[in-house]
Amino acid sequence: MLVLGYPTMAEAADAGPALLAAAPGRLVACEGMDSRIVDLVRAKGSPVPDLPRGQGWLFAEVAGKDTPDAVRRLVAAASALDTRLVDDRREAAALWRIREDGAGLAGRSLPTPAYGGWEDAAVPPEHLGAWLRDFEELLRAHGLQGVPYGHFGDGCVHCRIDFPFRPGDPASAAVFREFMTACATRLRDYRGTRPPPGTSQ
């Protein structure tokens, strides 16, 4: 398992296409997340193995022969702040648990309930970094919170969002409608969205 550290999650996403090109057909996983998920896992009291420097990370796994050579090519192409090769299976499993546990915690940690509705938004990987920057800006512009993460090698992002739904108040759905419309309009510029075949949360 190769862990790559970047200043931000969007910059981690920017590196995805270079990794895919450096090891074509060899990456069996290329997952992205940032320090918000790591902080949630730590706050729960779960151990977090050492991560490379940065606030955004890619977790990459390579399959096939000549794995050391493929890893060297990935590191050379990554333009990362810092890298860490994890050979110990137990430690690699603990790192994957951060992604798995954090994904669940991300939807339950906000001050108000979080909902699906903008799940599995996908763009071509070469546009993912730009889309993540736009997505975070759209959240802020609509007064919403969410913790994105996802399958960066596929250009696919998950995020549960604290839409301000209020029972019996149809007007409370207005923010949801406005946000979804704004996201769909912006995402069209990036030739999204369709979840890649076989992608799951």
Regions found by a protein language model. Give the residues of each.
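Noncatalytic alpha-helical scaffold of FAD-dependent oxidoreductases
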Residues: 1-198
